[in-house]
């Protein structure tokens, strides 16, 4: 792995992302609009909910949505022949994958900052210290690895970026409805417990409540980290073996 090559690739990928209006909307403006919409709905005490309950799910959803953009990006690069051209250069696959992972981590940090700042005026009052805030950011960065891995798996089984967009929702929707936005019941909990998003959301809720010693923080962080590492390794393996053709 070469740091110089990774830095050059990282710069290229970030410039490519921010030159595309669709990517800017999906990655930055959409989380902002969703936060504002949820703020107006759930920030009103008449609805019996608060942004303190909703915000952890918004943070997780921002990371989940990366699945689609990663799948689109890799499918586009494959369709344009960019990946094959990279194979003829001194660039190693580890440099390419490393820069892709880092670029998405940067986007996750931006998304989390946007959601955090916009949620504050709507009554989001995290009862934690600076360590808790940093821990929440770290948790979202770790969680983003699973989304990158699922994006790679989606790109592997998709013949085009358009198909990748549709298939990505196979991974997005279950994580949205099982423990991120929708309350978990005794019926849905066995399914939700398999979702990294559920454990990440539960850990975030405990962190923002100020209870850093809550077992949900440790178990949520541990499950999310292990699941994310397994998924990203599987995604890289499948894409290198079957998707880069």
For the regions a language model picked out, list residue spans one by one.
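Alpha-helical transmembrane segments and their short interhelical loops
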Residues: 93, 97, 101-166, 173, ...
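Alpha-helical transmembrane segments of multi-pass membrane transporters/translocases
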Residues: 37-39, 202-245
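Aromatic- and glycine-rich beta-strand/loop motifs that create alpha-glucan
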Residues: 1-30, 80-81, 245
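Short alpha-helical transmembrane interface motifs in multi-pass membrane proteins
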Residues: 19, 23, 52, 63-68, ...
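Transmembrane helix segments
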Residues: 37-45, 155-198
């Amino acid at each position: 792995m070469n740091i110089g090559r990774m830095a050059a690739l990282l710069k290229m990928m970030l410039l490519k992302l921010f030159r595309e209006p669709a990517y800017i909307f999906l990655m930055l403006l959409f989380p902002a609009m969703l936060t504002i919409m949820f703020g107006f709905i759930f920030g009103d005490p008449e609805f019996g909910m608060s942004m303190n309950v909703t915000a952890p799910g918004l943070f997780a959803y921002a990371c989940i949505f990366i699945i689609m953009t990663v799948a689109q990006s890799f499918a586009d690069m494959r369709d344009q022949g960019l990946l094959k051209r990279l194979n003829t250069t001194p660039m190693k696959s580890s440099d390419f994958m490393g820069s892709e992972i880092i670029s998405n981590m940067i986007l996750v940090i931006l998304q989390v900052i946007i959601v955090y700042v916009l949620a504050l005026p709507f009554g989001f009052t995290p009862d934690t210290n600076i360590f808790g805030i940093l821990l929440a950011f770290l948790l979202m960065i770790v969680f983003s690895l699973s989304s990158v891995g699922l994006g790679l798996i989606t790109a592997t089984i998709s013949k085009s970026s358009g198909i990748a967009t549709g298939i990505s929702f196979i991974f997005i929707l279950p994580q949205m409805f099982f423990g991120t936005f929708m309350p978990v019941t005794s019926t849905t909990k066995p399914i939700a417990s398999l979702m990294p998003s559920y454990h990440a959301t539960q850990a975030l809720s405990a962190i923002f409540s100020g209870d850093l010693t809550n077992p949900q923080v440790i178990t949520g962080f541990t499950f999310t980290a292990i699941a994310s590492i397994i998924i990203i390794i599987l995604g890289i393996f499948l894409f290198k073996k079957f998707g880069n053709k």
